[in-house]
Amino acid sequence: MKRILLLLVAIVFITLNISAVDADSVVVKKRSSMAYNGYQGGMMFNVGYVQSREFQFQDNNGLPLGQSHRLSGASMGLGGALRVGFGKYFRVGIEGYVSTLKYQPQGSSAKIGWGGLLLDSHWHIKKFTIFTGGVIGGGSYTHITMIDKGESFSENDYVVENQYVSYRHYPFLAVVPFVGMEYSLTQRISVVAKIDYMLNVTNWADDYAAGPRFFVGFMFGR
């Protein structure tokens, strides 16, 4: 996934350089409806409420460990996006984020990292810009649970390593619809806020925690 993101970043920057050269050296009387129309990039903080289905654990011998579990709570993280405008309403780019849910027992966490190709449409209303779109790309889910040594045994399907720690890590294809709004502070700086919901298309296990996330941050562009 890192190689794909690096390739996308390279493609976007090459596009920016070519477009900048064309804009500076070529005079056109009428712009194309899909002509290069600037770019923006920045960082955003995310917070959301996520929850999983019920799941259970087992030890390395296949014996059940503990009772049923369900993840739920606030997840938080950071990330960023880079978008290039084409025409009046269309933008394409890349984004990548990390979001982590921490829970008890201490040391337990469920972390999602994802990134991919971004497409959106936007509409300007004075200093405000409303946008909607989606991201398609790759995600990875890492779930670490510290097992309470005093738990009783029951039927399950999640393997516990080293007797008291469960570690699960798996990739998936992510589709992430979103809607949001920007407010222009200056010609080059905007405050941005959006809401999304990540769909795990290929590997939605019982311990996968999903829910809406709210993002807020700053975008810089020209």
Q: Where on the chain are the PLM-derived regions?
A:
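Sec-dependent N-terminal signal peptides
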Residues: I4-F13
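Short glycine/proline- and aromatic-enriched beta-strand/turn motifs that initiate or cap beta-hairpins
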Residues: A20-G85, G221
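Outer-membrane beta-barrel domain signature
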Residues: K30-S32, L65-L71, P105-S108, W123, ...
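Transmembrane beta-strands of outer-membrane beta-barrel proteins
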Residues: N37-F45, F90-I94, G115-L117, I130-G134, ...
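Residues that define the transmembrane beta-barrel architecture of outer-membrane proteins
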Residues: N37-Y39, S72-L78, S109-G115, H169-V175, ...
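Sequence/structural signature of outer-membrane beta-barrel proteins
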Residues: G48-E54, P64, Y97-P105, G139-H143, ...
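Gram-negative (and chloroplast) outer-membrane scaffold detector with strong preference
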Residues: V84-V159, Y183-L185, F220-R222
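Predominantly the C-terminal beta-signal and adjacent terminal strand-loop region
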Residues: V175-R222
